[in-house]
Amino acid sequence: MAADGYLPDWLEDTLSEGIRQWWKLKPGPPPPKPAGRHKDDSRGLVLPGYKYLGPFNGLDKGEPVNEADAAALEHDKAYDRQLDSGDNPYLKYNHAGAEFQERLKEDTSFGGNLGRAVFQAKKRVLEPLGLVEEPVKTAPGKKRPVEHSPVEPDSSSGTGKAGQQPARKRLNFGQTGDADSVPDPQPLGQPPAAPTSLGSTTMATGSGAPMADNNEGADGVGNSSGNWHCDSQWLGDRVITTSTRTWALPTYNNHLYKQISSQSGAANDNHYFGYSTPWGYFDFNRFHCHFSPRDWQRLINNNWGFRPKRLNFKLFNIQVKEVTQNDGTTTIANNLTSTVQVFTDSEYQLPYVLGSAHQGCLPPFPADVFMVPQYGYLTLNNGSQAVGRSSFYCLEYFPSQMLRTGNNFTFSYTFEDVPFHSSYAHSQSLDRLMNPLIDQYLYYLNRTQSNSGTLQQSRLLFSQAGPTSMSLQAKNWLPGPCYRQQRLSKQANDNNNSNFPWTAATKYHLNGRDSLVNPGPAMASHKDDEEKFFPMHGTLIFGKQGTNANDADLEHVMITDEEEIRTTNPVATEQYGNVSNNLQNSNTGPTTENVNHQGALPGMVWQDRDVYLQGPIWAKIPHTDGHFHPSPLMGGFGLKHPPPQIMIKNTPVPANPPTNFSAAKFASFITQYSTGQVSVEIEWELQKENSKRWNPEIQYTSNYNKSVNVDFTVDANGVYSEPRPIGTRYLTRNL
């Protein structure tokens, strides 16, 4: 029977045998058991998929696979030192086990949960026998430092560094002090409760409340309810990015819901109908919210692919502020009784607006403070009016956490399995996969006419294709789909002197309206040596810092270039090819016509659009019966169940009410806003490059031209800017 539901039978048998041996111990330190010593070549009882998480394993098995494995390695090293000194740590619970639990108290992986549970069971079994170290040893005033290899890189170290790279400490959402602070008055052996389902939430207790079971501190006024973390931890085939930002949430719409619609007289193509709400939402759906430019450089210069695996979200240090006016003086003070309301739409009941390239994301520069965007949505319309199927949602109909100053909110999410993003370019072209030294054994139709003296007669002649006839060789694969776009030149004088961005654009027609095919299917931006050209609506265009929203000049925007995919994808501004359009016979010659748009065909292969440091991470795949290769056209990962929207609002507090009853609803509220910090931790799985290529690769670097400025930094006014988009396809692979 497991002890307190934690102790498995095999561990109970092992501990029982150890207790029997303890009764027979002689004075002096117990001698270590020969089988208990770590051997560098021993496998031990390691959990499948791990290198160190388990007893009796070796200490030299390479890099830990994740944070739980790294904690297990440090624990094993501590046990090894105790065995060398003649102590036997297997027969007691000491500081090594306590530190192992402390380090993994926020780890929700299977290995982390199992490791904490095993040591908690060990502690409870050994407590009645007096084999648990005193608290002064178990929880010292300063936390035991984690040993690091002298070659361990940090988030700014160079790429390709040799030697072991031990895992660094993960973001500790429950930690209330820095690494040298006095620990919380909670027994270190108490494990946190693991998330039970998507969208699980935790609210810390208020000031003066006791410590919670899951190690959330008594986060009241005067005590921080979390710490600032902005870094990347590189763990072999994983990287964990952590971003913290400061947010501000105003009171939107004076706590009202409002209809919104297109203005009267608007063109039919621009009609809409929807609602604005008093709620805000958190948007961190851009890569530069999580990766610094240097970490992005390390990512794309060392990996052929990556994909997101897990996400942890936390709101902390929440402060509700009250604004008052008195004789022209504005006073801002903490309101300790007002609340904010927070919930996650884990069932995707609300219209999903993330992934639509909206402003309002976490800023790329950690020192910048941002405003939480207001949530609004569109529903079905006829012109500027609603129809019978139009939907309205009251967000107060959803259960929410009510948080005061000093409380916090956490949420965990696991990404669905998606393919790795291909962060490489091809070093071959789809039409050049053959051996150039020999002929094919297949024949092709070479001629339909032959000359006999001065006479020409119809005759079918066939030949084998070889090195001098590459275009005639049989091939297995076709390039990807095509939806042709108009070509523009970055040199204005090369373009027609007319206003044609809409009239000459490639569009599709849906529900009585036209929309641009923007950016459309992934296609190459231009042919070789034609860098000045780009498709009119076939690229992503980002604005530089401070660029006007309307009529921005070319030098104030950043246009992406998908030239690397021309090895498999058509050029967006060129025809796909030619196709026969008649039946030839003895009296009718054959004719062809251009193909300007080509859908998917069997045998087609192509590359998806690249992702960019400034671009989106994911988009929600629409809830439909059918879909074909739903890779978002703006780049990123297509997800059926993406990270849910996290909604937040300031709870209304009525202003001074009248002394007599009124049936009218309140329309006057005290002026409030809220602020605090938000941390987002994402674990990414990496596909390491292992090319056998001999000559050097092209890699991303910042010294692409001579410059007197430093890129990706602040100016004299403290404004941070990103001078160019950074994609991912610099390394190469064969087709």
Q: Would you name each region that the model predicts?
A:
Residues 2-154, 170, 177-178:
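Extended terminal accessory/targeting regions
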